[in-house]
């Protein structure tokens, strides 16, 4: 899927043609630079590696510095691969948000907000154990039983329990493109996308 790297700016709302107030996410999409072109003959598959956001040379490792010099571009902070670009791209070419002109829907990949260690009520939507009366006083938000006793004498894998919540790679599909503002490299997408303000996202057609 062809696409771009972008940065989530935040959320706002716009009015639709019929006067409805539509919540939307503002994403700074690109400009991205081609840092590597992969071919079926050499790499086994065809893809384009894009770089987003400049960074200083002193903060770049020597292997990556050689990679960028080979492409003839300045060091980039974020890299990602995309497939199936319609136009043939060469090293150093720039891909802008105009890629999404005419696109009705996109998929957005991001990293969800980290919530730390959370219990089963917040993490999995459990309802808690029973009533708050009839002698119960210390198990309102507990998971309850996690298995039988002597058989199977173990807790099955995949049992939903408390633990680290968030910080996962999340893909949201078929989000409507409301507007492309090419002069400011902005993309307005209906609804919310994963991640906090300033987080890096992948936008795919």
UniProtKB/Swiss-Prot annotation:
InterPro entries: Ribosomal_uL3, Ribosomal_uL3_bac/org-type, Ribosomal_uL3_CS, Transl_B-barrel_sf. Coiled coil: none annotated. Pfam families: Ribosomal_L3 (PF00297). One of its GO terms (cellular component) is cytosolic large ribosomal subunit. HAMAP family: Ribosomal_uL3_B. One of the primary rRNA binding proteins, it binds directly near the 3'-end of the 23S rRNA, where it nucleates assembly of the 50S subunit. This is Large ribosomal subunit protein uL3. It comes from Bacteroides fragilis (strain ATCC 25285 / DSM 2151 / CCUG 4856 / JCM 11019 / LMG 10263 / NCTC 9343 / Onslow / VPI 2553 / EN-2). The gene is rplC.
